[in-house]
Amino acid sequence: MNHTKSSFIKLALECQVLKFGEFTLKSGRISPYFFNAGLFYHGNSIRQLGQFYAKTLLEQEISFEHLFGPAYKGIPLATATAVALAELGRDITVTFNRKEVKTHGEGGQLIGSPLTGRTVIIDDVITAGTAFRESQTLIKENGGILRGVIIALDRCERGLTEKSTLSEIREQGIEVYSIINLFDLIEFLKNDNQYEQVQKLESYHELYGAY
């Protein structure tokens, strides 16, 4: 496992963003682990999180001008990523959306840079894909071109069909990248000799995994 992935997992554990146990998901599935990026709320952890997103994004060599952060969790994620990119010499603009359209003042649903060029969505996870579809529509309606999606964790899990939501997105020609995925977690736990947790994650993937 590379240093970036292991460092990200350690940070997620330290901030209790990543927990192991028994967690009931919205789908009703009982998951042996849970990831909540909303618990990255200290300044230093947010700074590091932005750096992880920026590094993952630059490694993919995607051509882009804008970052889009879907409300609500995507807003600080995209902002932190833009700051990290600026520190690396890439001055990128940021846009995010409101949940409700504002009818007074500047009005509209978007805040930040106009979405008129190549755009990358920054989010924590993609489960059912609802937020992604809303973001995709907003980007298209405002003249943007969606070039890719960066998320923190790919659960490698299928939805209601045999395919994962990420697979369905990729079938549209849109690539989805993640800082880590389920198999990175399994490798990390193996290296830490946590074989009981490894077995639980592997058993869960046998039931609900997408390949």
From Swiss-Prot:
5-phospho-alpha-D-ribose 1-diphosphate binds at residues 26, 72-73, 98-99, 102, 104, 123-131. Disulfide bonds: none annotated. Its EC number is 2.4.2.10. It is an enzyme of class 2 (transferase). Keywords: Glycosyltransferase, Magnesium, Pyrimidine biosynthesis, Transferase. It comes from the Bacteria. Its cofactor is Mg(2+). Belongs to the purine/pyrimidine phosphoribosyltransferase family. PyrE subfamily. PANTHER family: OROTATE PHOSPHORIBOSYLTRANSFERASE 1-RELATED. Homodimer. This is Orotate phosphoribosyltransferase. It comes from Legionella pneumophila (strain Lens).
